Every structure is written in C-alpha cells, then in structure tokens.
Amino acid sequence: MVLVRVALVQFEPGRSKVESLRVIRGLVGGYEGKLDLIVFPEYSMLDPTGLDAGFIYGEAEDLGGGWVGFFRDLASTRNSCVVATLFERSREPPKVYNTVVVIDRGGDIVGVYRKTHLFDILGYRESSFIAPGGSLFKPVDVCGLRLGVAVCFELRYPEVFRVQALRGAEAVVVPAGWYRGPLKEETLRVLAQARSHENVIYTIVAALYGSNFTGRSMVVDPYGVVVVDGGVGEKVVEAVIDTSLVYKAREKMPLLKLGRWSMLLEEFREAIRP
C-alpha cells in the first residue's frame, strides 16, 4: 500500500503571468502541509478569455523559462512532485501549446504533455490561439504513483483515459479551466466519475475558480466515488490517495482485462474510414 498526499491548488488566474504568479505564491507560500504531489490547473499562467492571440504568445515561454523554473524550484524546495501548466511557444506563432509538465521531487521534468483535443464547442474556439499536440501522454512513475495526464476538455474523450489506463496508469491528473455555464459543474463531476469507474483509476482534477471558471477541484476513486470536492473559492484542496485501492478494485472489476481491445481497434478503424 502506498499513500500519496495530494494538493490541488484552486485559484482565479490573472490576465498576465505576473498577476497569476502573485496569486500562486500567496496560496502555496504559506502552506505548511507535507505533500507528495501538488497539482495546478490548466490556464494557470493567465486567463485567456477574450485576449488577443498575439498577447498570449508574448506571455508564453519555453520549457526552460522562468515560469517552469518556479515550479521546478517549488518541487525541490518542498520535496514534492508537481504538475504545472503553461502556454508554451509553438512553431506556429502566434499559436501556443497548452502544455503540462510533470516534475519530480528533485525538480527534474519527467513528463511533458501538449493538449491534443481542443475546446472548440459552446461558442469557444481554443484552436484560435492554441496548436494541438500530436500524441497522448505516456504514464510516468512519480511520488509513488503511475501517473497519466489529460487536460480539461479531454474528460469528454474516454479514449484518452483508456489508453493511459492500459499503459498502467493508476491515476490520471486533469488540470482544468472548466468554464462556467448551465449544468457545467454537474458535467465536470459526472465525467470525472465516469472516467474513474470505467478505467478503475483515480481521477485528479485541479480546476480554476473565478468569474469565468467553476472551481470544483476533486479527486475521484477507482469506484467512481468522489473522495473530495473543493467547492468554490481560492484554496488548497487536500486528499490522500491509496494506490492499493486501484488493485483491489481491479480484482473485483477487471474491466481492463475483459476489454476486447483488438476487436474494438478494428471497429474504430472501420468507423472512421472515409
């Protein structure tokens, strides 16, 4: 049994990275809890709503920049693994990548994911300023967890989670900037529960809060039960993950073992064939 102490940092982002970093420092700087994994939301760098793509590109950085450097220092100083997000400059300016970095206790980057499925629904066009990544995240071992990564809107794509579960993920972390709207909080909860139950994994959602975003950071266990729901407001939301529960649940519900994946792959190929 491995117990992993997790913190989800829920906050309202600024309209620049300087403003956002000030908020982040205020939340985590005075936090005394001992943690194994600290997770930050999507769009942590800034709230892009209504901003010009050129401005966002100007705020964006490379992985070796000061923004990621802050989180690498946080990891090594706190002796905690960190999942952080940024707008990363792409090869298609003024578009950026919506990027997640996974950092180990020593401050080393051990995983990078660029969001592949972009939020182009409900009147919003993320593709107007973001370039999609080209591959799913391959789970990594950090702080006692085999950890996968998906981003916000990708909760609506079960395949993103299924592939990582089949690759051994015990938990999938989901940095999210979940926009407000009718039934959006309920949608977030239902999707997180479904992804957990059908893959028998923990789903860890770190969500932004504020005038544009719902909050409701949460951890869902392998049975689909919400372990903690952060509600609204700026806060650090804590939970403890027990990795042994993943394997106990998979003994009772061997969904991954029973899946007819080769058959389904052929069905997918036929379904999407022009």
What feature does the model see in each segment?
Residues 91-167, 180-190, 252-255:
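Active-site catalytic loop in hydrolytic enzyme cores
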Residues 84-86, 99-102, 138-140, 217-219, ...:
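Short beta-strand scaffold segments in enzyme catalytic cores
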Residues 3-15, 39, 112, 139, ...:
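Active-site-proximal beta-strand elements of phosphoester/diester hydrolases
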Residues 5, 33-34, 146, 168:
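Short loop/turn motifs at secondary-structure junctions
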Residues 17, 22, 26-106, 112, ...:
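Cys-nucleophile CN-hydrolase/nitrilase-fold catalytic domain and related Cys-dependent amidase chemistry
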